[in-house]
Amino acid sequence: MSLFRLYTRVLELLGKERRLGWTLAVANLLLATAQFAEPVLFGRIIDVMSGNLATGALVPETRSPWPLLAAWVGFGLFTILCSATVALHADRLAHRQRQAVLTSYFEHILQLPLTFHTGTHSGRLMKVMLQGTDALWRVWLGFFREHFAAILSLVVLLPLSLYINWRLAILLFALCGVFTVLTTLVVRKTYGMQNEVEAQYSDLSARASDALGNVALVQSYVRVDAEVQGLRFVADKLLAAQMPVLSWWALVTVITRASTTITVLAIFSLGIALNQQGLTSVGEIVMFVSFATLLIQRLEQVVSFVNSLMMEAPRLQEFITVLDAVPAVRDRPDAIDPGRLSGLVEFLDVSFSYDGKRPAIEDLSFTALPGQTIALVGATGAGKSTAIALLHRAFDPQSGVVKIDGMDVRGLTMSGLRRNIGVVFQEALLFNRSIAENLRVGKPDATDAELRLAAERAQALDFIDRNDLGFDTNAGERGRMLSGGERQRLSIARALLKDPPILILDEATSALDAVTEAKVNLALDEVMKGRTTFVIAHRLSTIRHATRILVFDNGKVIESGTFDELVAQRGRFAELARAQFMVQEEARAAVATATDDAPVRL
């Protein structure tokens, strides 16, 4: 993305603040015009006092300097008031819009598909959000407070200086042109280098976040020194990339200071020569020296602005790239909110591919009646999770239709559809908030009595009441203050509060010990009552009483039936069942043999 296009996008993000932005632009134009009145009046006052008539006619000739001085005071007061007003409103605009864009970005990334979040480090997304919005704030604030006025000053100065004395004006702009060319070369030189710097910043953030997210692993394997050394290595690469950029911008500082001195001396030299020929006045020479000083200052501001924009460009580009990421699915313009559904689910010849080449799901058809339990079985990558993802519209199928209560899910609003579907994940997902707040994710307006009832039905009330703070107990980051079984029972209580007609159990007990699994299964039996339930399972013992079992292989359903029917068919499912049960029988036999062979002690 070009720098100009990037900056256009930055201005587009002003949103509702555009009207204020235009008002500030007009105020900056007036400010830029008024600022040049001071050197003009200064020069005219000198001419009047020295009796040397000016060659220009910008100000009517007068023998008294007092009217000119009064005008100078008036323009000075106007400039002060206008500058203060612009600065105040520019500050407010930048702060308000930073918060608005931050909220918009946060809402946007929460709506992006899980595949995006799987492939993007959460630490990077946080860095992009915070650094991107801070960069927007700095650019907006600097632009409307001073940089836009500086740019307009250059536009105003050209015709004004040509009108007063075209000879001095040509010299002034020739010298400033050289300054601009040299600065532009430095800007182009450092643009790619700064992109490399920001890439190193992203690596640094991701590595630090990765280590902090696995701090238990780092400590248990005594990897603290190694991780610190790894971070130091990335930081050294960052510093190595940053130093050349800083050197080039130090050169810009030298060019700026040299340009100021050379320009003032050149104008004085030419002005003296012209004055000796009667082609300019002393006041005009002083006026153009003031112009030169003012122009160099404005060019410095413009260069500073371009410099800051160059420094911020990688952050802004990264921010806008995430902001431009398109959700895999969206609400159709004519989508409807279905209200509460009964739970009749139909897959009709559904096919889906992630890459457009190998099908993840192919010609899948089945019907789940309200209240039935449908189990999905198969090896990893067989298509179970993909089928469920199509149900709650993480993706849309390339062909076929997924229906609920006879309605194509693509015709329903996302919020309306997902309000009717509850999910109990394999790893219970909890916020770093109180237990009550985590449960109210399922039902924000739930009363305390409803929380207790849901926790009781989910076999969670006992451990909640054991805590001194009860429902106000903080779950910790990702629920780490609780055990795996406690987290899972809270997840089930949350689903009970949501009370959806359709429930998805994604390996809900696979990571639990036998005792905890028994408690969780009691809670699951409670939450499954009266709901259409889909169970993704590797432990076949957990789906013994499923209404129907679908056996997946390479995106297709190769077997379908009840547990007993599938075992009787002696197919793939029967092999899985025998393998799992044989492992359990062999384990029990080994324990029994060890017990029999052990010596008896009296």
From Swiss-Prot:
Any one Pfam family match given in the protein's UniProt record, by short name: ABC_membrane
Has keyword Protein biosynthesis? no
- Which annotated residues bind ATP? G378, A379, T380, G381, A382, G383, K384, S385
Task: Give the superkingdom in one word.
Answer: Bacteria
Give the EC number: 7.5.2.3
Q: What are the UniProt keywords, alphabetically?
A: ATP-binding, Cell inner membrane, Cell membrane, Membrane, Nucleotide-binding, Sugar transport, Translocase, Transmembrane, Transmembrane helix, Transport
TM ranges are 22-42, 68-88, 146-166, 167-187, 254-274, 276-296
Q: Give one GO molecular function term.
A: ABC-type beta-glucan transporter activity
- The enzyme class is translocase
Spell out the CDD domains in the cross-references: ABC_6TM_NdvA_beta-glucan_exporter_like
The record ties this protein, via Gene3D superfamilies, to: ABC transporter type 1, transmembrane domain (1.20.1560.10), P-loop containing nucleotide triphosphate hydrolases (3.40.50.300)
Please report the record's description of how this protein sits within the membrane: Multi-pass membrane protein
PROSITE patterns per the UniProt record, alphabetical: ABC_TM1F (PS50929), ABC_TRANSPORTER_1 (PS00211), ABC_TRANSPORTER_2 (PS50893), NDVA (PS51317)
Q: Where is the ABC transporter domain?
A: 345-579
Record localization: Cell inner membrane
**Where would you say this protein principally sits, based on its record?**
membrane
Please tell me whether the keyword Translocase is annotated for this protein. yes
Q: Provide the Gene Ontology terms for cellular component.
A: plasma membrane
According to its UniProt record, which protein family does this protein belong to?
Answer: Belongs to the ABC transporter superfamily. Beta-(1-->2)glucan exporter (TC 3.A.1.108.1) family.
Q: What does this protein do?
A: Involved in beta-(1-->2)glucan export. Transmembrane domains (TMD) form a pore in the inner membrane and the ATP-binding domain (NBD) is responsible for energy generation.
Domain observations: In NdvA the ATP-binding domain (NBD) and the transmembrane domain (TMD) are fused.
On assembly, the entry states: Homodimer.
Name of this chain's protein:
Beta-(1-->2)glucan export ATP-binding/permease protein NdvA
Q: Which organism is it from?
A: Rhodopseudomonas palustris (strain BisB5)
Q: Which gene encodes it?
A: ndvA
